Amino acid sequence: MKTVFTLVLGLAASAPAFASDVVNIYSFRQPFLIQPILEDFTKQTGIKTNVVFAKKGLIERVKREGKHSKADLVLTSNFSALIQLEDLKLTQTIKSDSVNNNVPAAFRDGDGQWVALTKRVRNVYSSKERVGELPKLTYEDLADPKYKGQICTRSGKHPYNLGLVASMIAHHGEAQTKEWLEGVKANLARKPQGNDRAQVKAVKEGLCNLALGNSYYLGKMLEDKEQKGWAEAVNINFPNQTNRGSHINVSGAVITKYAKNPENALKLIEYMTDSKAQNMYASLNMEYPVKSGVELSSLVASWGSFKEDSLPLDEISKYRPLALKLIDEVKFDL
């Protein structure tokens, strides 16, 4: 595993006398996204936060450390990591009326093993110049032969695409989803590669007309001097607005099985699912809050309202192994 960057956050100088309380966090989410929230949490509660940040390897670390792990809480950047932690039995039940009231049932585990903190949409980006807006587009349309040679995407095995394929299985079954995957593969402009931003760049450069990507990357690219031109070259489309709604992925949190400070971890989750932190957390990363009624960032709000797929995430998660199997069977990435 690569060297882990450790970030220790706390307000020891200004915190109240009970600041000896602590919560230890392993985070897949970048420091700039969580630091303002954790600082405010410490200010409000006196509970210090110690953070270990890494882009990869944290789940393996929690598993390897076992009972000796210092992690009380894991913050994930995608839904797949939440499911991995649960499947490996590295979590404990989140019991909180506050969390249950703040987070709709579709965005928390039915057994209380994880909870979502922010939402993002699996959008289809389209070239403004060559395609225009596609308000009636569906994920199913991506397999239509009329789009042959026009689609770009990252690996089908990436958690973002794996979740989408799992949702297709949940809605359409194995056989129809395999046929759909074969159709999408036939329409690819190039082999799956790169990240979501690379797909938008490819649209800008004329390599493809459509690209799969998470909603928040558009906001991130518009803030980046080098990438702003890529983002300005595409429209953001919310698929399946005429039927079930667009597929949603999430970031989230779990309390670890061997947490030494589970009460403080729960307090942090309760704080992060309440209105103030929801607004901060979602706005910093151009995402959508999981709590209803929380104001969106002005940029995200400018994309307009849309219908979400209401299928619970823990239902979709049941089909992740089969989704991976189908992606391999159709040789999607080859």
Residue ranges of each PLM-predicted region?
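A structural signal for short loop-to-beta-strand junctions that line the ligand-binding cleft
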Residues: S69-V74, Q92-V124, E140, I151-C152
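Ligand-binding pocket segment of bilobal, Venus flytrap-like solute-binding proteins
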Residues: S167, H172-P239
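Early extracytoplasmic/lumenal segment of secretory-pathway proteins
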Residues: S20-Q84
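Short beta-strand->loop
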Residues: Y26-R29, T91-N100, G110-D111, W114-V115, S126-K128, L134, E140, Q227-H247, ...
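Periplasmic solute-binding protein
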Residues: F79-L90, D109-L137, V165-A166, I248-V254
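Extracellular/periplasmic bilobal clamshell ligand-binding domains
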Residues: S298-L334
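Mature extracytoplasmic/periplasmic domains
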Residues: S251-S310
